Amino acid sequence: MQNPPLIRPDMYNQGSSSMATYNASEKNLNEHPSPQIAQPSTSQKLPYRINPTTTNGDTDISVNSNPIQPPLPNLMHLSGPSDYRSMHQSPIHPSYIIPPHSNERKQSASYNRPQNAHVSIQPSVVFPPKSYSISYAPYQINPPLPNGLPNQSISLNKEYIAEEQLSTLPSRNTSVTTAPPSFQNSADTAKNSADNNDNNDNVTKPVPDKDTQLISSSGKTLRNTRRAAQNRTAQKAFRQRKEKYIKNLEQKSKIFDDLLAENNNFKSLNDSLRNDNNILIAQHEAIRNAITMLRSEYDVLCNENNMLKNENSIIKNEHNMSRNENENLKLENKRFHAEYIRMIEDIENTKRKEQEQRDEIEQLKKKIRSLEEIVGRHSDSAT
């Protein structure tokens, strides 16, 4: 069985950009369960270390007693969905495994990786090269198979894998990130197909030496042990995520029921408020109509008041005229009274003068009688 292929340098840049996109999208998914795979508290140690020693272009892979963990794939460096269920519904197709090529070996040999750089290695799970244009929904960790990639069998090259491992393995321990069961199944499928291809290749290839066979058998046992540990860790993490997700759903269901009851209460309250609002609207219309009627009556009363004011002003003018006439009459009365008094005085004066004249006439009559008597006596005496 061949070792899993490594991600090429151009795939490393693509994985880094996908990791930045996923970290930006993960901040917006607070209410959903995290799709990332839970890492164990203690890093899984593998009981071997690949020490690169090259002599005249040959690769010697030896087993060391000091266990140093090689870098394993971190699925969180790839853009994935927010729902963990989608990770188990669309596994990676085996044709996405990049077969070794001669130009890739040259490129990997000329590529100088930084000392502290971590390479994300996924057994039988990598993205296609950049030359293929793939369009799929965002946050989908398992993109559909593009039309340009054929469903071909996996052909792995031991020399290509060894060179890639020697050029990309860091010198320090890294944390182990486990894959979900769907990815393990796809990895098993890819490795089984790789075993079949190896059996077919063994017919034509020369028989390797004893050291290589020992390394292959020990590596196969270690890979089986590592795969079993990864499966157990992945199942445990999946159960934990499942329980957490179910608890989260139950909590959300309870919150939804509470919100639904509160919404029903608010609906009934809204209906009662709507009825009260309709009653208030009817009362408002009645008050508005009453105000309109009162305004019309007020206008009529204002008109009548204006008419009364006009009549009052007319009466006042007539009263002033009558008062002026009364004043004039008083003046005329005084004048008539004076004339009346003068006429009475004139009448009295006239009566007094007539009495004086009558008295004078009586005196004259008396004088005449006395004279007649005197004359009669003289005549008698003469006779």
Swiss-Prot record:
Residues 88-101, 185-206, 227-237 have a biased composition (Low complexity). The gene is YAP6. The keyword DNA-binding applies. GO terms for molecular function: DNA-binding transcription factor activity, RNA polymerase II-specific; RNA polymerase II sequence-specific DNA-binding transcription factor recruiting activity; sequence-specific DNA binding; transcription cis-regulatory region binding. This is AP-1-like transcription factor YAP6. Residues 221-284 form the bZIP domain. GO terms for cellular component: nucleus. Residues 223-247 are annotated as: Basic motif. Transcription activator involved in the regulation of genes expressed in response to environmental changes and metabolic requirements. According to genome-wide promoter binding and gene expression studies it regulates, among others, genes involved in ribosome biogenesis, protein synthesis, carbohydrate metabolism, and carbohydrate transport. It may also be involved in pleiotropic drug resistance. When overexpressed, it confers resistance to cisplatin, methylmethanosulfonate, and mitomycin C, and increases cellular tolerance to sodium and lithium. Homodimer. Residues 13-64, 168-184, 213-222 have a biased composition (Polar residues). Its main location: nucleus. Belongs to the bZIP family. YAP subfamily. Residues 249-277 are annotated as: Leucine-zipper. GO terms for biological process: negative regulation of transcription by RNA polymerase II; positive regulation of transcription by RNA polymerase II. Keywords: Activator, DNA-binding, Nucleus, Transcription, Transcription regulation. It is found in: Nucleus. One of 8 closely related fungi-specific YAP proteins (YAP1 to YAP8), which all seem to be transcription activators of the environmental stress response and metabolism control pathways and to have similar but not identical DNA binding specificities. Residues 1-64, 83-113, 168-239 are annotated as: Disordered. Induction: Seems to activate its own expression and that of the repressor ROX1 which in turn represses YAP6 expression.
